[in-house]
Structure formats: C-alpha cells, structure tokens
C-alpha cells in the first residue's frame, strides 16, 4: 500500500523541462533530499547515497516518451 503518491503532468517548453530536471539534480547532489509541494504542503524525502537509476525510451508511431526513474 502506498503511503503517498504524487504525480504531476504539465506542458512545458523543452527549456522549462530541462530547468525542472536540473532543479531535481541540484537537490539530490547538494542536500540528499528531494522536496515536493502539493496543496500548500511541503514534503521532503531523504534519498540515500546509493540509488538505482532506470532510463527508458519508447518510440511509437505518433509519440515519444522518456522515463527517468530513481528507486532505493
């Protein structure tokens, strides 16, 4: 059973998406925590020193999808 799941989808420019990914990378490298805000509530998740990284690329006829997943 999930304690909490946050999913957010939004349309961004390529540059805006890169900036958002960069912000996550900076949080991981500097603080060892990820911070999320949802409904006025701030959630902080500690990330250990070692994680598993999964990168998946799907090419379909009418759509492309890149998934980046960290698990620990």
Predicted regions span which residues?
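Terminal, regulation- and interaction-focused segments at domain boundaries
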Residues: 1-19, 24-26
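Short, structured protein-protein interaction patches enriched in aromatics and acidic/basic residues
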Residues: 8, 32-54
């Amino acid at each position: 059973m999930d304690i909490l799941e946050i999913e957010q989808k939004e349309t961004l420019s390529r540059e805006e998406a890169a900036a958002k990914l960069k912000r996550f990378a900076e949080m991981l490298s500097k603080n060892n925590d990820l911070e999320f805000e949802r409904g006025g509530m701030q959630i902080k998740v500690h990330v250990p020193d070692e994680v598993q990284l999964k990168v998946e690329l799907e090419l379909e006829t009418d759509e492309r999808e890149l998934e980046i997943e960290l698990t620990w």
